[in-house]
Amino acid sequence: ALLALGALGALGVAVAGQARGAGMGGMAGMPGMGGMAGMDMGQSQPTAAAPGVGVFSRALLIPPELHGQPRDGVLHYALRMAPGRSMLVDGLQTATWGYNGAVLGPTLRVPRGKAVQIDLNNALDQSTTLHWHGAHVPGEMDGGPQSLIAPGGQRRVHFTLQQPAGSLWYHPHPDTRTGPHVYAGLGGLFLVDDPADQHLGLPQQYGVDDIPL
């Protein structure tokens, strides 16, 4: 099964029996996408899966995982939204936006029942938000249009997920601008891990048999 998301076409994880992005042409004229030349947002670089038999000329890129850093009983995460440049087609650099990198974002792993704190930093030239799509969180932490982060601004969210294992995603949600922000590259997987899921015998090796597409 494949969970299709909006960022760059499709972003998800295919696993046996359950669901766990990439055309970007025409972005040069997008409002607010100027001034990106020379920017290197490579803090979070995806890895390439081993190429298999087929017609594809480029290896599938696997977004890095982001596990929270434990401190005082809380898992701490940080996401920075910033412009960058990505080679989506060989020989052609495209202006993109990303979380902790040039395009898209790392795969967040959040354990069920653990308190988390996520620090958000907006290095874009536009206001944006960060919405936890499918997560059961309080409204003030949800990252909807009412929770804008101004250019250069920061926001801290905290919550504890009490829901079963699931394949969610995170993305911007500014009023009337959600689409352009996602098309620019802002989006990432948000996986809820539940110890009760371990005995089911499902694929568990991220990037090996648990593949984000």
Question: PLM features: residue spans?
Answer:
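N-terminal export leaders
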Residues: A1-V13
